[in-house]
Design a protein with these regions (language model features):
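Solvent-exposed loop/turn and edge beta-strand elements of beta-rich ligand-binding domains
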Residues: 1-141
C-alpha cells in the first residue's frame, strides 16, 4: 500500500546461476545455490545477499519479484550506470566487482510537494580465487 518508505519492508528477489557444479553457500543460513535452480531470498533496506566462491564465467540472473508498492526500481551491475529494470544479468569475472545494486524509489505525497523515498539493496557475488593456489618460485642465488 501507500505511505512512506518502510525500512523494515522485506523485498523479494530470485536468483538463478548457471555454469556451476555442486552447491554454493550464501550469507543466509540454510540458503544455498545450485546450477539452474531459482533461489528466492528477501532483503531489507541496506542489506546484502552474498553468494560465495563462484567460478569465473558463471552466469547469473537476479529478479526483484515483490517491490512492496515502490513505483521505480533501478539496478546497477558492477557499479555501472543504473538501468530502470527489475532484472539484472551478468557473468562472474575474476578481475573486478561482481555486484548487483538495486534501488527502489517510492513517490509519497508531502505537504511541501513530492518526496522521493529511496531504499538501497545489494547482491554480491564472490568469485573464487582462480584455482585457489598461488605459486612462488624461489630464485636460485
Amino acid at each position: 500500500g501507500g505511505g512512506a518508505a518502510n525500512k523494515n519492508d522485506d523485498f523479494t528477489f530470485k536468483v538463478t546461476i548457471t555454469g556451476i557444479d555442486g552447491t554454493y553457500s550464501t550469507n543466509v543460513a540454510g540458503k544455498t545455490i545450485t546450477n539452474g535452480t531459482e533461489t528466492e531470498f528477501t532483503l531489507r533496506h541496506g542489506e546484502t545477499f552474498v553468494v560465495k566462491n563462484l567460478p569465473e564465467n558463471a552466469s547469473y540472473t537476479v529478479v526483484e519479484t515483490d517491490k512492496k508498492g515502490y513505483q521505480k526500481t533501478e539496478v546497477s551491475v558492477n557499479k555501472e550506470a543504473n538501468q530502470t529494470s527489475d532484472t539484472a544479468e551478468g557473468t562472474i569475472r575474476m578481475d573486478g566487482e561482481n555486484t548487483v545494486d538495486y534501488t527502489n524509489t517510492k513517490t509519497v505525497p508531502s505537504p511541501t510537494g513530492i518526496a522521493l523515498e529511496i531504499l538501497p539493496f545489494a547482491v554480491l557475488f564472490l568469485a573464487a580465487i582462480a584455482g585457489g593456489v598461488v605459486f612462488f618460485r624461489r630464485k636460485r642465488g
